[in-house]
């Protein structure tokens, strides 16, 4: 009985010495973390957000404390800045609470900040060193907020979440290109990583516009990358300017046996202000300037050099189809016999969108195009199932009010 009583006294004493971190009167806080990585090469990376809600005017924050004890390597971090967010939680950078240039297990930002009645937003940003490892994680928690009403420990809405480290491969304005979009990533036979994308030189918009297909390459598992360079560029073909010779939507597949890399893209010639998916932006038949064209570039040396552009429209597109184009994204290789399978899309004779696949059993020397799935769909991805069939996951536009996914399994007969 004495031991139990003594234990109770010690426990009561210990807890009486700890500061109370339940919500201070009239103030409570939430911690939120997004499910996306912090990127090497970016000036700001959102690693944690705080919503501090005051029930009335007159309260203020004195300090905010952040713990990084679960972070794999603190020296991956170059600096951290705490910002005051916008009224709706926008990640604004107009007002900085403070910056820490030396990583540590615990950071305390001491500054008096008057709280308005209602929600007050804060977000912690980190800038990563160029040497930060892609295998590492950042583990951050706002462990304490000191206010004029007392101490608060924010409620964590995503407990246990860690932030992965990534690499900002292409950023808006990099190399003079306005926007990079439509990425496709694959691994070459020598282990190199290859990233393909639209290089949208003038603006964000789709075709018709000055767009080339670009490439960045990594030979160290994605830790560093080469600068973007175009591999599919029509220039001023046919005497028309580059903004009437746009190439977009890369689709890529690597033959694991030969190492050949095939990249397809859709090319529009002329038709300024039009889009291949709308109206007469593309037309039936094969005529350049009327029908959007399917182009192919091939590399035999792991993406170092590329063939001249090949126009394969007549080889693949049915004449009555309005459009035939890459899905885009990645193809797959069937495990049983090495068949190459590439998801593709298009518009049928009535102009309605469709999805299907094309396949090659001779390492890309020739390709067989499947029939449209029958679903009103477009962009799609393929995966091989255990029985060797191919499941096609498609963006469906059957219900115009709500975009949905549609799934169809194609048997070996279709391949």
Give the label of every model feature segment.
Residues 1-7:
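Bacterial N-terminal signal peptides that target proteins for export
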Residues 9, 63-65, 183:
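Short, solvent-exposed linear motifs at loop/edge-of-secondary-structure regions
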Residues 24-164:
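Exposed, polar/acidic Ser/Thr-rich sequence context and nearby capping/turn residues
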Residues 7-17:
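Bacterial N-terminal signal peptides
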Residues 23-24, 358:
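Disordered, low-complexity tails and leader-like regions
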Residues 42, 87, 94-105, 118-123, ...:
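Asp-box/BNR beta-propeller blade signature and adjacent active/binding-site loops
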Residues 18-22:
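Sec/Tat signal peptide C-region and signal peptidase I cleavage site
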